């Protein structure tokens, strides 16, 4: 992909790391303060300048931009107004289809506009307009629920044990400081949830006077798309979901099953390739050995971030190793080689990937939105012991210190005790049942949202088509030309997409290093 790495975007979707608004930078505190505006009589779209990210996005040069103005909390009369950044990108075709496609990004909390180049390269605007809206609280919105405090902690955390007491103390302080700053600015943290998110998109369609449109969402955006389809089905022509997080089952313990499934599929694919099987004959055993060894005897070393720059101190322990694999850093094709090198005393690949976390785009990721959704929708009804139980089931024999933390969401339960938002599990953990055509896309190497969950979602969607792409990880479409063709075919013929290109696909060869 030009300029932007797919790994950077997928890491953002999985909360690993992710600024300015308009023509001038706005601090997190001033952006939050801008929320205090009179509530409009009805949601409306107000034209305005397009965001100007540090790395220019070519598609925004021709886009029609502005803000969607909506109530911060629709359940409270007389509340405040928030502004959500919107871009309408014209279709490449001279005679485009009348029904546009609206995009729902992952995260929650990832910079939606940063995904635009991947959407363009995937042909999302080839035959129809592409509409992008930053979900409430994201970068370029007013307010922006970024947490620079958490970004700075993440940069520091690479030099700490993944599950160490010091890491927990510093993270919880960052969460507390962010919450205090946002609430002092008047932000209603309880209003940043999937129900309100879905209502925002329903209001956007009406505000733009669009009779019917198509929906495409990945990762958390698939959760949002399914919720939107359930609560606001009017005006939806077709829905495509990629790397599915089913609303009815997405909880903090759920992540362990997805991690185990994705890793199992990577190792199984290696075993199916003679050269890989011969060079790396027992990867499950090797991974378990390395997790145990690093958790008992963590490595502390200096490493250069994979993106370049000065070396930084990193601690590589069992928890860090597992979470680097979940983040698909290194790439799936390199994981067997990286594990083999690690077992032979060469941790360079994993150390550089760990060091990459020291380079944070401070203020770009809306950790406030992440916490409001994770704490209100994913954490309730379960406990830290449930996370540990799920971890033990997924990876028997691994150290409890590794398994006690949900993948990529360490210390989330104590963080939720600080964040203190209402329990929304009952209203959010509901299966979507619909006859609207739905395309369900998954990748067999997805270590964040297991591919098998797609089947359960599809069962409740009577006109659904499920496609599983071999050898692809999280967020399938930008990584697979075949998936791009399937998606285009689906939007052209939602009830009869051409999925034939998937037949015969195989994972690319794994990296084989000399013995």
Give, region by region, the residue ranges found by the protein language model.
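Catalytic-loop region of hydrolases
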Residues: 2-13, 27-169, 206, 284-290, ...
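Glycine-rich nucleophile elbow surrounding the catalytic serine of serine-hydrolase chemistry
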Residues: 111, 199, 217-229
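A catalytic-pocket lid/entrance helix-loop region that shapes and gates access to the active site
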Residues: 146-158, 225-290, 323-327, 333, ...
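Conserved acidic catalytic loop of the alpha/beta-hydrolase fold
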Residues: 183-187, 195-212
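Conserved alpha/beta-hydrolase fold motif
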Residues: 215-217, 239
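Conserved alpha/beta-hydrolase "acid-adjacent" motif
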Residues: 447-452
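Histidine-bearing beta->alpha loop at or near hydrolase active sites
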Residues: 470-476
């Amino acid at each position: 992909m030009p300029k932007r790495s797919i790994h950077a975007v997928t890491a953002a979707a999985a909360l690993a790391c992710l600024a300015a608004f308009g023509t001038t930078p706005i601090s997190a505190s001033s952006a939050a303060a801008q929320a205090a505006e009179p509530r409009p009589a009805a949601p409306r779209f107000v034209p305005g300048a397009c965001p100007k990210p540090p790395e220019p996005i070519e598609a925004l040069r021709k886009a029609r931009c502005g803000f969607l103005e909506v109530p911060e909390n629709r359940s409270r009369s007389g509340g405040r107004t928030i502004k959500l950044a919107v871009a309408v990108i014209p279709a490449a075709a001279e005679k485009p289809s009348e029904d546009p496609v609206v995009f729902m990004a992952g995260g929650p909390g990832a910079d939606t506009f940063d995904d635009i180049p991947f959407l363009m390269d995937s042909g999302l605007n080839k035959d129809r307009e592409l509409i992008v809206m930053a979900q409430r609280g994201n970068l370029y919105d007013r307010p922006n629920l970024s947490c620079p405090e958490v970004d700075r902690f993440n940069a520091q955390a690479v030099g700490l044990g993944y599950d160490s007491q010091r890491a927990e103390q510093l993270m919880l302080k960052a969460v507390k400081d962010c919450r205090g700053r946002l609430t002092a600015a008047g932000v209603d943290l309880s209003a940043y949830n999937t129900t309100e998110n879905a209502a925002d998109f329903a209001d956007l369609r009406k505000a733009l006077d669009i009779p019917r449109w198509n929906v495409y969402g990945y990762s958390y955006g698939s959760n949002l798309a399914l919720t939107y389809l359930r609560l606001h089905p009017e005006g939806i022509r077709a829905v495509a979901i990629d790397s599915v997080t089913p609303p009815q089952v997405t909880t903090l313990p759920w992540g362990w099953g997805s991690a185990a499934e994705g890793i199992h599929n990577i190792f199984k694919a290696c075993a199916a390739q003679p050269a890989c099987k011969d060079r790396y004959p027992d990867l499950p055993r090797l991974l378990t050995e390395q997790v145990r060894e690093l958790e008992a005897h963590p490595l502390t070393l200096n490493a250069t971030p994979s993106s370049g720059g000065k070396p930084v101190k990193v601690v590589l322990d069992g928890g860090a190793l597992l979470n680097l694999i979940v983040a698909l850093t290194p790439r799936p094709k390199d994981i067997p080689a990286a594990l083999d090198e690690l077992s032979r005393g060469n941790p360079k690949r994993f150390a550089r990937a760990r060091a990459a976390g020291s380079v944070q785009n401070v203020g770009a990721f809306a950790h406030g939105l992440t916490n409001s959704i994770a704490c209100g929708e994913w954490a309730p009804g379960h406990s830290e012991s449930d996370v540990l139980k799920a971890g033990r089931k997924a990876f028997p024999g691994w150290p409890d210190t590794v398994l006690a933390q949900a993948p990529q969401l360490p210390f989330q339960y104590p963080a939720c005790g600080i964040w203190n938002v209402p329990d929304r599990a009952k209203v959010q953990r509901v299966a979507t049942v619909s006859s609207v055509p739905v395309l369900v896309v998954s990748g067999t190497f997805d270590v964040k949202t297991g591919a098998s969950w797609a089947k359960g979602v599809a069962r409740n969607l009577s006109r659904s088509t499920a496609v599983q792409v071999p050898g692809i990880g999280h967020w399938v479409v930008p990584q697979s030309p075949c998936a791009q063709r399937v998606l285009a075919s689906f939007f052209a013929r939602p009830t009869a997409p051409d999925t034939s290109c998937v037949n015969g696909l195989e994972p690319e060869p794994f990296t084989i290093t000399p013995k």
